[in-house]
């Protein structure tokens, strides 16, 4: 090996003939040559070597990238160990997919122009500055350079579903194969079908090349135009070193350091596999960080970000150690067992790739559990607030009389295994507390808690779906509480938490209610049905207010033809409290949908039949309840009211009316007067009749 000529890829490094090179760490030594510039120029032989080719690959592995750039195993190990800083088109080596679930196809254009070499018969007689060689750590000298240029067009899809990666990659590859077929003429165009056009519009392009471009291509169309121009830009003046031939320094200076040995192929393969495995974990972490659910849960986002930083630090430390070992092996100070031991130690550490992937599996499961719950919860259209300060500000809003909050109780940024990884980074010689994450440390690794969380999410959604209440607001948040597994539905009344495991509202007997706040829970917002309104009734304010005035509309089969009445859209599917603001003569109550609409008989008049119950107020008759044509006067403690509450407890079969001077949404605890309690045997709809104005 000490006397072997080396052939290495230039990788964008500024090689010149006669330059010195240290093959032990693959570094150029600028500022020194073996010969004077005049001698080098006189001894240089140049020959033309024109060629061009293109290649398309659908792989992002370091092996395939190295193959495209003709990088041999030893230099590849140096690159992976961080010894080589690449430039120009070789920056393509650093371009890695951001996401694991992402399709990538690369198009390479490669051209060569000429080859320059130094005649080796120069020997030692022309060597200059030999007295400085003792302090110059160079093992080789550059005696040949092949010039040319490389260009890489890297096409990436957006992040896709894991099941579609290969399919999309195949579609991309088929389209990109058409680019080299473009004629080198004035205009560049590729004939694409509409489907292929859609495909090209969905992926991006990144360019790495040895060509100077005024602007780099970012789209498929840009790439076609740029690819067409590359051959015209090629020439000796624009060429850069691509491949370099190196002769050992001992041929010119016997005391020069030598490249004594190199690692075997199996060991170099371990270097590649170990570092690429960490890259795969990092891409997997990027996939998770890009999930919209993670953006909601800052604690999960923090864990993933910390994990990513820890992996980056581990990668940097591992690369630095690999670089030292490679230099020691190539200098003859250590044998390749030094690298073997390094990777054995890595396998016995918490940073073994099996443990890192296991942690990602746990974290992906947590994300999936949270996502499945959020998919259910969002159907309730709650306010999603993961900032506790903002949440309690919302709960203190005077409009929020009642708050139901679905709380994720075990989402935390704390993680025992991340602590182990961090501690091991700081003290790699210490004995780690554990080598891999344990399922018992993660609540979501078992099915019972996630299943319970989904059940509560369905309950929360159903509660929100059933209620149309201006006083009850729905929220979703995350508050860490180890005492409550998974999640809970917390109930707040006027910003005070009352229940931490809410299932359904408890309504006391209507006679026992002493606080109007107990009724506010059932306050609901209904809209009037224009299809049922008598022709002289006009609806406004989003069909929540009605007054008299002729409507110009077509007749409806469902409208009341004789009596000035209107029904609500919503049926009474549970126990709502309807708040009616009144002025003048008002009749309000409940009726069955089957009430007659077209006759002038009592069958069509609210309160005059067995299908309806009504509370009525007129200045002439005062207060009275009406059912089946029977009027019963009602005595109240104060005359006049602004709000009529109609409370139907269908499961209990009761109907109650309340009157008051304040709205039912008012914060005052004063309870309106209960003026009627009747019994119902079936499920009615809301209905009202009026001689003046009515609104809810």
UniProtKB/Swiss-Prot annotation:
GO process annotations (BP): killing of cells of another organism
InterPro entries the UniProt entry points to: B30.2/SPRY (IPR001870), B30.2/SPRY_sf (IPR043136), ConA-like_dom_sf (IPR013320), Cytolytic_pore-forming_toxin (IPR052090), PRY (IPR006574), SNTX_MACPF/CDC-like_dom (IPR056072), SPRY_dom (IPR003877), Stonustoxin-like_helical (IPR048997)
Highest taxon listed in the record's lineage: Eukaryota
SUPFAM superfamilies hit by this protein: Concanavalin A-like lectins/glucanases
Domain B30.2/SPRY, chain residue ranges per copy: 506-696
Gene Ontology cellular component list: extracellular region
Tissue specificity note: Expressed by the venom gland.
Subcellular location: Secreted
Modification after translation (UniProt): Glycosylated.
GO molecular function: calcium channel regulator activity; potassium channel regulator activity; toxin activity
Keywords of this entry: Calcium channel impairing toxin, Cytolysis, G-protein coupled receptor impairing toxin, Glycoprotein, Hemolysis, Ion channel impairing toxin, Neurotoxin, Potassium channel impairing toxin, Secreted, Toxin
Description of how the protein assembles with itself and partners: Tetramer composed of 2 alpha and 2 beta subunits.
Function field: This lethal (towards mice) toxin induces hemolytic, cytolytic and hypotensive activities. Inhibits calcium channels and may activate ATP-sensitive potassium channels in frog atrial heart muscle. In guinea-pig ventricular myocytes, it modulates calcium channel activity through the beta-adrenoceptor-cAMP-PKA pathway (ADRB).
Family note: Belongs to the SNTX/VTX toxin family.
Protein name in UniProt: Verrucotoxin subunit beta
The species this protein was found in: Synanceia verrucosa
Lineage of origin: Eukaryota, Metazoa, Chordata, Craniata, Vertebrata
